[in-house]
Amino acid sequence: MKKQFAVFGLGSFGESIALELQKLGCEVVAVDKDMERVNGIADSVSYAMQADIGDPEFIRSLGTRNLDAVVIAEAESLEASIMAALECKEIGVPNVIAKAKNNRHATVLKKIGVDTIIFPEKEMGVRLAKNLMSASFTDWIALSPAYSCLLYTSPSPRDAH
């Protein structure tokens, strides 16, 4: 059975998540209040709809509790983000991931019980800085605050002489 996800907020971050999940063979419901954004992605995902993600009635009517996860990519409207996260947790969505605008927003999301809180711009900035520090590191992922997994390109034997 295909995994099913909802992505709330179709800015560049949300849109890229929705498109990649769809490309990976998942069923994706993409939601935004801006009809232009909805129209821009409608032909590329399973379902695209215009709605206010801060409206609990909408979230319940969507059947979100039956999804594998909901990604709340909307962080400009703190109220909509928080209300969507609260409703998703209250109705039993198994995995709620939310983008935080700032540390206070993240604190509220954590208190609501959001499973994963992300700061995409901050995380990408740290990742890029670490990549810039060594031409040998081609990629890395943080496993915990103390451990990382690195993809390292070793120099060719003739460069070692």
Where are the model-predicted features located?
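Glycine-rich Rossmann-fold phosphate-binding loop(s) that bind the pyrophosphate
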Residues: L10
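N-terminal Rossmann-fold NAD(P) dinucleotide-binding loop
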Residues: G14
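Short beta-strand element of Class I
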Residues: E27-V28
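Conserved acidic E/D residue at the C-terminus of a beta-strand in Rossmann-like folds
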Residues: D32
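Helix N-cap at the beta1-alpha1 junction of Rossmann-like dinucleotide-binding domains, i.e.
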Residues: M35-E36, N103
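Short alpha-helix immediately C-terminal to the canonical SAM-binding loop
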Residues: V38-N39, A106
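Phosphate-bearing ligand-interacting subdomains
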Residues: S44-S134
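Single conserved hydrophobic/aromatic residue that forms the stacking wall/gate
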Residues: Y152-H161
